[in-house]
């Protein structure tokens, strides 16, 4: 059995904590920008609102305002002759419940005038509890420092506590996904109530750990990072597909696009053994998301 070289995942979980703090910073910056956006709106404007988490926000991009997928979609719309006003409402670390609450409370500016809305949400709902679980046991999982499931350090751990904590994280993810369905559906209803003619598209989620086959066994269970993430992402994508069918929403299949891509679409693909903590899209990955949305919204 391989030792669990979990440094990448562990640091991602730590990055999620940082992302929440950055999310507050991002909201402040976005609020200032929204004042400028209001000044750009005219009767001929086409309003595009991008809702979502750190992927939408453009986390880790060097030039996020130009490289994130919403900017690339807006650029395409301008090429088609639209006087588009892009309103990026991505918030680092955001869960679907946070997004729904913001929509419900009227905190998403320009949404009541939106002509196009894209959703990129659900990865945190599906995976954040598991990432925090791994972070809790990081001292035991650092494969590169010699601690793994066959190490003397690992043998000292209380396996029952380990299994209990994993099961609690899994239940938390299941609770998140149960709410995810309602949050997504209710968010769409609120948007359509405010903007009945708005065109809405939702992307399926990529698995950020799809090639990570490190695993560890305890208490009769085996936890494989890539397989566990695949299971939860699959659940989220099933919910997304179901909501799209029920609500007649455009589905943008980014899961398949990422799975079949031969390009470096995620930052952690650049690092050996996934030591790089960043599982967010590269600029190439952001372009891929934009391409999938554009095809789904404008060419089908």
What are the roles of these predicted feature ranges?
Residues 26-92, 107-111:
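Serine-esterase "nucleophile elbow" of acetyl-processing enzymes
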Residues 205-300:
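Catalytic His-Asp segment of secreted/periplasmic serine-dependent ester chemistry enzymes
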Residues 32-43, 99-117, 186-197:
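Short amphipathic alpha-helices and their capping/turn segments at secondary-structure boundaries
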Residues 98-175, 207-208:
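Oxyanion-hole/transition-state-stabilizing segment in secreted/luminal serine hydrolases
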Residues 14-25:
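Hydrophobic alpha-helical membrane-insertion segments, chiefly the h-region
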Residues 54-57, 91-96, 123-128, 206-210, ...:
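Solvent-exposed loop/turn segments at secondary-structure junctions
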